[in-house]
């Protein structure tokens, strides 16, 4: 089973870019093959902006409708791209906070996840999105259920600085997180382990985003930082940057965690605790 037995009906949301129809179909087929009921998204009205699935108002309305539907057990994002930050001031967070529902995705979904954390609404879950469900590898597949059940997941990382640290998780795409810095939807990071990933960014831009988050105070009271995948970035330059960054913040730092746009992807919830000790990672609820 991809998802645990308590996830019987999934609501598909498209909060950012539009998913290609063939990927929508293959993802829904993968869910139904597992015996999961799917609330298929009604086509959003045409949007003049090609890289968005619909207007901010229509996308926000779609989320609220499915979030508050008592028959829906989980919200699954169809894909990332760009657009989630546009929705944050449009969502009725007070109303959404009354129902604790998992919302699964990553990448641009960081904007929703961090706002959920800041407004204490729902449960952010990092896991594959609908468009990739039919093509995930076995390691990724086996790790998904643990994000909902709390079952222990383990892997290995490279220690950049320090030996051990532990805390609840705050994870996100680096570029999106930097966009939220200093705004109304920037979450409290006290006692958290910060997990960050990105894709196709030159190292100087990664440094710029890390500097912005550093100056916004994200790392001040955090327990440490774990870097996921940064595919498309120069590995040697990244290693140098991570070392300089660790010296700047004077916190434990690890790199190479399987989280990001590459496979495998280890799924987890913001309610999980992550423990890193001498390069070994254990995640459990």
Where do the PLM segments sit?
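Conserved beta-alpha junction segments in alpha/beta enzyme cores
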Residues: 19-23, 168-201
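Internal helical hairpin/lid segments
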Residues: 185-238
